[in-house]
Each structure stands twice: as structure tokens, then as C-alpha cells.
Amino acid sequence: MAEDCVDHAITLGRLHDEPCPTRNLRIHGYLQDSSALCELDVYGSDAAEIRALAKNPKLAMQLHPALPYIAAEVVWAARNEMARTVEDILARRTRALFLNAAAASTMAEPVAKPLAAELGYDAAWVTAQVNDFQVLAQQYRVV
């Protein structure tokens, strides 16, 4: 898509055309073989780190039976993607809120607990995060 945009700009601006220098650039997350992907492989080369975290049985726990996310993804997002709230995880990291608001609503506490442990927050923070997310999730539920 970016190459199409640049090609169009070259045409419109009557600029000198050169071969795309990034055509074979391997960006972060690159996988050599993506033919047999599983759920965590959306993380590309980072999936191995999440699988390593999931060796801890508490982090291998699926957050909801209707969605494929596990607690290790919460910890990984806090450590590597600056996720800081339940909303960060369930809306922007996993998109669970948009895929299934009812399921995401029940995932709030199972997400808040490992996130709080990772970030050093207390039970009051967990409660506040769960309550805040419940209010938000209500707006996404199909009536």
C-alpha cells in the first residue's frame, strides 16, 4: 500500500522513479515461514516470547472461552507495548472489546489482575479498572 502511494506521488509530481529500496526489508516481527500460523503468531517473531511467558500456568490461562487471548499477552503488552490499562489491553492490543463486548466485559478482571501485578498496582486499582471498563464495554454491547 505504501509503495502504491509513493508510485502515485511519483506519477503526479513527475518525479524520478527508482526501484523500491524497502521491498525486501524485514521489519520487526518478520517470520520466515508463516504458512502454519497459530493464534499467537499475529505477534510475528515476538510470539516466542509470549509462549515462553505462557510456560507459567497462570499466564497460559485463556481469558475467555469465546476469544483466543491468554494472560501472557497481557504481561507481554505491559512490558513491550506500554499497555497501562484494561482498556489498553482489551480495546487496543487484542481488540476484544470490538470483537465481542460481552466477552470482553467478563475479561476485565482476569486482565486487570496480571496487569496490576506487572505494573505494581493494588487491589483498589484492579477494582477501579474493572469498573471503568464495564462502563465502557456497556457502550459497545449490541442491544
Regions found by a protein language model. Give the residues of each.
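C-terminal accessory subdomains/tails of enzymes that are appended
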Residues: 2-143
